[in-house]
Amino acid sequence: MTKKLFYFIAFLLVSISVSFTFSQRATAESYTSDFSNQLGTWEDLVGQVDRKISQGQLNIANQKLSTGYESISLNTDAGNRSSGDVQITFVYKGQTNFGLVFRAGTGNTKNYQSFAYMSNGNWQLGQPGGKWITDIHSQSLEIGQTYKLLLRYQGTSVKAYLNSKIIYDNPHVTYSDGSTINGDWTGATGLRLFGNLSQLLLLSLKTGEVNSIPEVLDTQQFINLRDKWKQQLITENYDSNNAPLVKYVNTLSKNAQTLYQSMNRSPERKELWPLKAGDTPSANLTTQFSNLYLLSQAYGTKGTDYYLNPELLADIQSGLDFMVSQKGYDGQKYYGNWWDWQVGIPQKFIGSLMILGDKLPSDKIQEYTKAIQSYVPNPYQQLYTKAQDVFVDLAFIPNFSTTGANRTDLALSVLGLGILQEDESKIELASNSIKEVFQTVTKGDGFYPDGSFIQHNNIPYTGSYGNVLVKGVGQILATTKDSSFEMDSQTVSNFVSTVEQSFIPLIYQGTMLPGVNGRSISRAPKDTQVGYGSTTMYNLLIVANLAPEESQKKLQEAVKYWMQTNPDYYLNNTRDYNDLQLTLSLMANTAITGDMLPFTGTKVFASMDRFVQNNPTYMTSLSLYSNRTSSFEAGNGENKRGWHTADGMFYLYNNDGVQFGNSYWPTVDPYRLPGTTVDTVALQDENSSFTTVTSPETWVGGAAAENQAVMGMALNKQGTKNNGTVLPMNLRAKKSWFVLEDQTIALGAGISGDTTASIETVVDNRLLNDAYHYQVISNKGNITDASEESKKDWLLLRSDHQNASIGYYFPTSSDVTVQSEKRTGTYAAINSAFPSDKTYSGEYRKFMINHGQHPQNANYAYVILPEATQEKLKNYTQDNTLKILANTESIQAVQMETAGYLGINFWAATGGSIADITTDKPISLLKQNKQTQTTYTIANPTQTNEIAHIQLPKDFKYILSMSDGVSFDEATHTLSIDFSGSAGSAKQIVVE
């Protein structure tokens, strides 16, 4: 065991060292470091230097010592040379007295040579002993700009280039005393700071043999990158026989005509277009740039009425000038929402510049990009949000680094700036900055090992911010593919794998599940758009285009499965030409059949308290919350009534075609969401800034395998806030769901609390399809009253359409209220940031169990049976195959022997005992019997790093397999499971 551990650690260390090779490479010929991963090895030859990596950059600063300010810091990883090339890329911040060191002898403070920028604006070349040449001139350095300084030295010859322009060329360097530069010295490369306290912000360091680093930029690569970006936005190849393309172009042309005709082109104008309803002042700026971008698309797309129209081009440029000079997007000041200035505007602005390209004067391109660069200096810095319509100086949040989708949004703009400014360092910075956003995390924002995606620290956001992240990363990787900036294949493969496991299980009929869309569920959809379906499909196609062959086919098969149910929808709702051509290519590819449901079975997303089950005819999902995950997010006037969306909300998708769709969120009763146990006391619309509410409880999660699962949630509403005020809620409950192939058994116990309203468990709250006919039937007959309450053994919501009926069985005859309710609403009522006054209506059927105002240890039990019929329900009630073994605060357990199913949630800190299974810790356990084999799937939903000891039934002889961290004591028949680092994921043992 000890030897194995030693070899494993040795292998791991070797693997780790290899993993850094992309960001820091050294060979006999060359060395490169972009400081994206590690600092490297440095040695102070003179003085003392502070070095740290922050936001993919090396910050290096000298200190004042008794000997003065002189400091020389050598990078020993770069090796020793007597001749070669050395290049640094740095951001100029107004500092002086800094430069390169070469041929530096380790340990000899008098044996080095230097090329440095001085306080008088000149450069100096020389070495200790008063041997300096100080009259080397270059263009003035401009604060905030990025520069590449390349030094080429060989014998007595020295050449220096600044941003590809030669500033010094001397084949035989001679000092004023007549001596020549020591060309035979061999030494290390480094950095020098002197004369005063100074800092240097370094983006990269490169060294190599003479002529190994090109002194002049390859401008063709920037042209190629710009063309690739441009071709994603427009097409210059128009085929009148391609019906979807013709429709796309005609729609673009029509939209452009509407915008162009309404554009204010007067010299005295105050706005280009009138303020759009709901726009804040900063959002209005984004809208104006978005309109100019659409006009740019029409100008560049062949087949529109405005293709290469010189009058439109002049008006677009005039509009851009107006927005920069008159509306304040000049790089100096800002107001309102940071997102508009750093994401919304730059992406549309850069898109316009990519399309217009060489149609605009080069000095205009530089003027525009310089303004954008002030707001987006790098992918890491984020501005504060300020008051609207009051200009203030740029204020970046100190000691802060962007994460997740915000990082990729900024990185995409930095990439665009790098291409337009022909700045390699910006392109490299953009690429390096996105690597960590799809590397898995264990806390905070990002993707987790189980596929969860978190943004804003504790909000499940795969469908919204996760989609933005994938789009941004995908576009960056697609743009740089087949260029010198292309990401290495392993990194791309890791990204693709992350996307596969994080997105595919969370999609139903092409739409992201609402439980992972955060506050975005309150945004009004476009008239033709369903949820986040089209956006997700297009993003997955972008990723598929980058993926290794096997993953590419998997993603394309998945997307085609969803798209081919309504291809016209996906062809007619594209964001740009790239979406259209990817969709057309997929639909025409006969090798991709799309005939298999992309995901079947169950999956627990423990790191965001979500669960899904997918079958060929229906899909279910659970939204829960804990001390790790917030119950909901409200902010920017969005999701004002999302209070109970994670109180155990149970999503059941079937063939009704309307559930959780466009009309659902503005019309559903927000106090009675399906699956929840709630205190229905009236709450105020949530208007506070980015509200999140976590629970005191840790026990949330479960265990899943194949198409079965057991899930649980310790519900605790104590500490719940409404607009910053702590509510007097004290509702508590233990809620469990036992999931089988064709049913979900829901148990509740320990339901206690006090309210002035009522505490209820919502069995279901179903939106009806207006085109379907429904009937509610109980074991006592048809229910036609608008509101009816009585004891019931079962209920059936019967539809005249296939796979749209649902049965509800109550194992212990329960008082169930049935209500019919017609509701109307608008998205404006739940979202003032993206308001829509369109009125939606919905007919609902509610099934509820009322626990009263002061329940103490109340409980419930019901079974949801998708696709049920009256006959199936009657048979189910008579079969007696369902056994509820326990429904208490300490244990909830269900057995279905005919399905080989046993599910147990042990709630107590000391565990418990039932069904010949004993544990000393709180766990969730799923036991599955198949012929002679039994599989135990066990999780610790509290996510504490504990060892659980579990005694199993003595009904097996052999252990076939065990997960890592699991051991078995045959003498006591006890499992020991180390849950350290499992983060809620389950362990398995298979026995026979």
Description of each model-found segment:
Residues 37-68:
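Extracellular glycan-recognition surfaces and repeat-rich motifs
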Residues 257-524:
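Aromatic-lined, polymer-binding surfaces characteristic
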Residues 27-46, 214:
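Extracellular carbohydrate-recognition regions
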Residues 170-206:
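Flexible glycan-contacting loops in extracellular carbohydrate-active proteins
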Residues 127-148:
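Short, aromatic/His-centered strand-loop micro-motif at the edge of beta-sheets
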Residues 145-159:
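Localized edge beta-strand/strand-to-loop motifs within extracellular or lumenal beta-rich domains
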Residues 476-935, 939-943, 947-952, 956, ...:
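Extended polysaccharide-engagement surfaces of secreted carbohydrate-active enzymes
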Residues 64-125:
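Secretory/extracellular carbohydrate-interaction modules
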